From Swiss-Prot:
Annotated S-S bridges: C110-C126
Family: Belongs to the natriuretic peptide family.
Site (Cleavage): R97, R98, S102, K103, M104
Family annotation (InterPro entries): Natr_peptide (IPR000663), Natr_peptide_CS (IPR030480), Natriuretic_peptide (IPR050787), Natriuretic_peptide_brain (IPR002408)
GO biological processes: blood vessel diameter maintenance; cGMP biosynthetic process; cGMP-mediated signaling; negative regulation of systemic arterial blood pressure; neuropeptide signaling pathway; receptor guanylyl cyclase signaling pathway
Annotated signal sequence range: 1-26
Regions crossing the membrane: none
Gene Ontology cellular-component annotations: cytoplasm; extracellular space
Organism, as annotated: Felis catus
An MF annotation (GO) of this entry: hormone activity
Lineage top rank: taxon: Eukaryota
Protein name per its UniProtKB record: Natriuretic peptides B
Post-translational modification comment from the UniProt entry: The precursor molecule is proteolytically cleaved, possibly by FURIN or CORIN, to produce the active peptide. May undergo further proteolytic cleavage by various proteases such as DPP4, MME and possibly FAP, to give rise to a variety of shorter peptides. May be cleaved at Ser-102 by the prolyl endopeptidase FAP (seprase) activity (in vitro). May be degraded by IDE. During IDE degradation, the resulting products initially increase the activation of NPR1 and can also stimulate NPR2 to produce cGMP before the fragments are completely degraded and inactivated by IDE (in vitro).
Keywords (A to Z) from UniProt: Disulfide bond, Hormone, Secreted, Signal, Vasoactive
Amino acid sequence: MDPKTALLRALLLLLFLHLSPLGGRSHPLGGPGPASEASAIQELLDGLRDTVSELQEAQMALGPLQQGHSPAESWEAQEEPPARVLAPHDNVLRALRRLGSSKMMRDSRCFGRRLDRIGSLSGLGCNVLRRH
Protein backbone atom coordinates (compact mmCIF):
# COMPACT_ATOMS: atom_id res chain seq x y z
CA MET A 1 0.00 0.00 0.00
CA ASP A 2 1.19 3.49 -0.82
CA PRO A 3 2.32 5.53 2.27
CA LYS A 4 0.16 8.50 1.22
CA THR A 5 -2.92 6.32 0.98
CA ALA A 6 -2.20 4.68 4.34
CA LEU A 7 -1.71 8.06 5.99
CA LEU A 8 -4.94 9.37 4.45
CA ARG A 9 -6.89 6.33 5.65
CA ALA A 10 -5.43 6.62 9.16
CA LEU A 11 -6.35 10.30 9.35
CA LEU A 12 -9.88 9.58 8.14
CA LEU A 13 -10.23 6.81 10.74
CA LEU A 14 -9.05 9.14 13.53
CA LEU A 15 -11.42 11.87 12.33
CA PHE A 16 -14.31 9.41 12.26
CA LEU A 17 -13.55 8.15 15.77
CA HIS A 18 -13.24 11.71 17.07
CA LEU A 19 -16.57 12.77 15.57
CA SER A 20 -18.50 9.64 16.54
CA PRO A 21 -20.94 10.11 19.47
CA LEU A 22 -18.99 7.91 21.87
CA GLY A 23 -15.57 9.04 20.71
CA GLY A 24 -14.57 5.48 19.86
CA ARG A 25 -15.12 4.32 23.45
CA SER A 26 -17.49 1.64 24.63
CA HIS A 27 -20.05 1.99 27.40
CA PRO A 28 -18.53 1.78 30.88
CA LEU A 29 -19.43 -1.33 32.86
CA GLY A 30 -20.14 0.57 36.07
CA GLY A 31 -22.82 2.75 34.48
CA PRO A 32 -26.33 3.12 35.80
CA GLY A 33 -27.89 -0.27 36.05
CA PRO A 34 -31.53 -1.35 36.08
CA ALA A 35 -31.68 -1.16 39.89
CA SER A 36 -30.73 2.52 40.02
CA GLU A 37 -33.12 3.35 37.17
CA ALA A 38 -35.95 1.54 38.97
CA SER A 39 -35.30 3.47 42.18
CA ALA A 40 -35.29 6.79 40.28
CA ILE A 41 -38.59 5.89 38.62
CA GLN A 42 -40.05 4.87 41.99
CA GLU A 43 -39.05 8.26 43.48
CA LEU A 44 -40.75 10.07 40.60
CA LEU A 45 -43.87 7.95 41.04
CA ASP A 46 -43.99 8.72 44.78
CA GLY A 47 -43.63 12.44 44.10
CA LEU A 48 -46.45 12.27 41.56
CA ARG A 49 -48.73 10.49 44.04
CA ASP A 50 -48.04 13.15 46.67
CA THR A 51 -48.84 15.93 44.23
CA VAL A 52 -52.08 14.27 43.11
CA SER A 53 -53.23 13.76 46.70
CA GLU A 54 -52.50 17.44 47.52
CA LEU A 55 -54.50 18.57 44.49
CA GLN A 56 -57.42 16.33 45.45
CA GLU A 57 -57.42 17.73 48.99
CA ALA A 58 -57.43 21.28 47.65
CA GLN A 59 -60.30 20.44 45.31
CA MET A 60 -62.29 18.90 48.17
CA ALA A 61 -61.74 22.03 50.26
CA LEU A 62 -63.07 24.23 47.44
CA GLY A 63 -65.96 21.89 46.64
CA PRO A 64 -68.44 23.05 49.34
CA LEU A 65 -67.84 26.70 48.45
CA GLN A 66 -68.94 26.16 44.85
CA GLN A 67 -71.87 23.77 45.34
CA GLY A 68 -74.52 26.35 44.35
CA HIS A 69 -72.88 27.15 41.03
CA SER A 70 -73.18 25.08 37.91
CA PRO A 71 -70.35 25.00 35.36
CA ALA A 72 -72.43 27.18 33.01
CA GLU A 73 -72.90 29.83 35.70
CA SER A 74 -69.20 29.92 36.50
CA TRP A 75 -68.45 30.24 32.78
CA GLU A 76 -70.83 33.19 32.46
CA ALA A 77 -69.38 34.82 35.57
CA GLN A 78 -65.97 35.10 33.97
CA GLU A 79 -65.08 38.44 32.44
CA GLU A 80 -65.73 38.74 28.75
CA PRO A 81 -62.76 39.63 26.54
CA PRO A 82 -62.74 43.14 25.09
CA ALA A 83 -64.73 43.45 21.88
CA ARG A 84 -61.98 45.30 20.04
CA VAL A 85 -58.84 43.21 20.01
CA LEU A 86 -56.99 45.23 17.36
CA ALA A 87 -57.26 48.65 19.03
CA PRO A 88 -53.56 49.60 18.63
CA HIS A 89 -53.72 48.58 14.98
CA ASP A 90 -56.81 50.78 14.47
CA ASN A 91 -55.06 53.75 16.07
CA VAL A 92 -52.21 53.41 13.59
CA LEU A 93 -54.67 53.31 10.70
CA ARG A 94 -56.45 56.43 11.97
CA ALA A 95 -53.16 58.29 12.30
CA LEU A 96 -52.20 57.36 8.73
CA ARG A 97 -55.58 58.53 7.42
CA ARG A 98 -55.19 61.85 9.24
CA LEU A 99 -51.78 62.36 7.67
CA GLY A 100 -53.15 61.66 4.22
CA SER A 101 -56.21 63.86 4.59
CA SER A 102 -54.69 66.77 6.45
CA LYS A 103 -56.36 70.02 5.40
CA MET A 104 -53.11 71.91 5.64
CA MET A 105 -51.41 69.52 3.23
CA ARG A 106 -54.28 69.65 0.73
CA ASP A 107 -54.46 73.43 0.64
CA SER A 108 -50.74 73.96 0.48
CA ARG A 109 -49.48 74.28 -3.07
CA CYS A 110 -46.03 75.77 -2.42
CA PHE A 111 -44.59 74.59 0.87
CA GLY A 112 -44.63 71.54 3.04
CA ARG A 113 -46.42 71.34 6.34
CA ARG A 114 -43.65 72.89 8.46
CA LEU A 115 -43.16 75.86 6.18
CA ASP A 116 -46.91 76.40 6.08
CA ARG A 117 -46.98 76.57 9.85
CA ILE A 118 -44.13 79.06 9.88
CA GLY A 119 -45.78 81.01 7.07
CA SER A 120 -49.08 81.31 8.91
CA LEU A 121 -47.35 82.83 11.93
CA SER A 122 -44.95 85.14 10.11
CA GLY A 123 -46.98 86.20 7.12
CA LEU A 124 -44.72 84.31 4.70
CA GLY A 125 -45.76 81.43 2.48
CA CYS A 126 -48.43 80.67 -0.11
CA ASN A 127 -51.62 80.15 1.92
CA VAL A 128 -51.39 83.19 4.12
CA LEU A 129 -54.40 85.41 4.53
CA ARG A 130 -53.25 88.98 4.47
CA ARG A 131 -54.72 91.18 7.13
CA HIS A 132 -54.47 94.86 6.23
